[in-house]
Amino acid sequence: MSVSFGRPEALSLVHRSGAVLILVLGVACSPQPPASETASSTPSGAGTVADDLSPQTLAAGRDVFRFDTFGDEQFWTDTARMHEIVQKSVSAAKALSVGLKVDADAIPPDVAAAIKAGKVDLNDPATTVTLLKLNAVVGLKGVISTVNGKDNLTRLGITCALCHSTVDNSFSKGIGHRKDGWPNRELNVGAIIALSPAITPAQKAVYNSWGSGKYDPRFNIDGKSTPLVLPPAYGLTHVANETYTAEGPISYWNAYVAVTQMHGHGNFSDPRLGINIRQTPDMVGPKLASLRAYQHSIEAPAPPAGSFDTEASVRGRVVFNQNCITCHVGANNTDNNSGVLHTPSETGQDPAYALRTANKAYRTTPLRGLWQHAPYFHDGSAATLQDVVTHYNNFRRLNLSVAQQRDLVQYLKSL
């Protein structure tokens, strides 16, 4: 996600400071990015050759995804001053209420037992600082100094996991084992940004209007607000281009987000965006290969047992193949792997966001793990899979019967 502090005047911030994270947005330097990633096919040298899937590389990539800020404390601490707010007024209860998650595996057994017993004050900001000291807040990285027995949060940054990981709630709501790649649809990014003392009341109003699970990755560029649903970061192995508008492959996306959105200390250049950021040392580029390898290793989650009607899904697959497969083609159910994009008028989608992008069109969304990440469409305008089917049945005049629509929904749940 991108934290923006204004409009054209915020463009200077785009070049040196920042935004919250959403692994979205990527505008390739060619009208249609190629399906494969090479160093010559993506800007800023972001492309890579085939993934190194060794255990060492995957472990390194996992650590980057979960814990690496790329030096973005230069924005979140020095500019946004978020550490001050967290230290003074963000209790653990408040953090959980805006969708932040806690990694139960990072909490020592004695602390976990104390929380269970109600002996830890979740309404005290000091508890949040303690959780940061334990490296237990998913997607946040703090530096703690202890003076006269008191822990003080002196630096704060964000990681990829902030928006693209959640937990299984196995300990309690908001606390559990990590689920990397799952979008945190409970995360209220705008409300978090609005806590910053460095933004204006007008900006706070925009941020607070987004709601949970949404973020606008261009607000800091053009000042317009059409927030998007946080996308999943799993099942990406054979997906050519990321983001709702397919503006770049995964390595471009990671470089763009790390430098211009998270505001990490690294290099990114794209003349089409008017961005040319060069920072020494480069704390982003050397980590892109392992990060991509780890992301490619995250498989889409299988639907839970009993979550769909098996017999209906078999019938629904027939309906799908007769009506949907022209666009949702191949193993990952997207024709964008062949370079195809669709104008809003082709799909009946709101054009507002697409018109702000280089491609002015939307990608056919891959469908693996579809059951997990409601709401649907780029703007979350379809609350359920039934809403998706109803939309296309009406817009494309498919004339599906009620039974066919129900079967199709069950098939989509099975993917």
Residue positions per predicted region:
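N-terminal secretory signal peptides that target proteins for export/translocation
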Residues: M1-L13
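Sec-dependent signal peptide recognition
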Residues: H15-V20
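C-terminal motif of bacterial Sec signal peptides marking the signal peptidase cleavage site
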Residues: L25-A28
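Electron-transfer interface patches adjacent to heme c in soluble/periplasmic c-type cytochromes
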Residues: P31-R62, F67-A161, S165-K173, H177-R292, ...
